[in-house]
Swiss-Prot record:
The keyword Aminoacyl-tRNA synthetase does not apply. It comes from Bacillus mycoides (strain KBAB4). The lineage of its organism: Bacteria, Bacillati, Bacillota, Bacilli, Bacillales. It is found in: Cytoplasm. Pfam families: DUF150_C, RimP_N. This is Ribosome maturation factor RimP. PANTHER family: RIBOSOME MATURATION FACTOR RIMP.
Length: 156
């Protein structure tokens, strides 16, 4: 059900976001306590202003109210994905090459499920990371079918 809702919302949101020269990054539909939240993440090369979030929220809300594809009450939240943006689409991974990323896998690889390092390459099937372990550097390859989630990582 939740996946179907996100797919429906993506179909409504994509043309709205494109018309405003923005990018649809992700859609989440989650229950927290007794409340349902529909979160839509947008971005652009220059970042996102609050007015743009408001414009997308208003237009998307009108479209969803008109068609009413979601069976119960929910809170709509349109925002930027933030500094630790999720990496979900092929384009996201390609744009992240050379940047610090955090990868979580479904099952351990070399005894670990969490990896943080520089994304060296992405070929559609495999992520190659450069890990720094104390003073050592280690390259690791992670098959995409083993990736539970991936995001940009903020380093200080």
């Amino acid at each position: 059900m939740d996946k179907k809702v996100t797919e429906i919302v993506e179909a409504f949101a994509q043309p709205i976001v494109e018309e405003l020269n923005l990018e649809l990054v992700d859609v989440e539909y989650v229950q927290e306590g007794q409340d349902w939240f529909l979160r839509v993440f947008i971005d652009s090369e220059k970042g996102v202003e609050i007015e743009e979030c408001g414009a997308v929220s208003e237009r998307l809300s009108e479209a969803l109210d008109k068609e009413d594809p979601i069976p119960h009450l929910y809170f709509l939240d349109v925002s930027s994905p933030g500094a630790e943006r999720p990496l979900k689409k092929e384009k996201d991974f390609q744009q992240a090459v050379g940047k610090q990323v955090a990868i979580k896998t479904y099952k351990p690889i070399d005894g670990e499920k969490m990896f943080e390092g520089k994304l060296l390459s992405y070929d559609g099937n495999t992520i190659t990371l450069l890990l720094t372990i104390k003073t050592r550097k280690k390259e690791i390859q992670i098959p995409m079918d083993k990736v539970a989630n991936a995001r940009l990582a903020v380093t200080f």
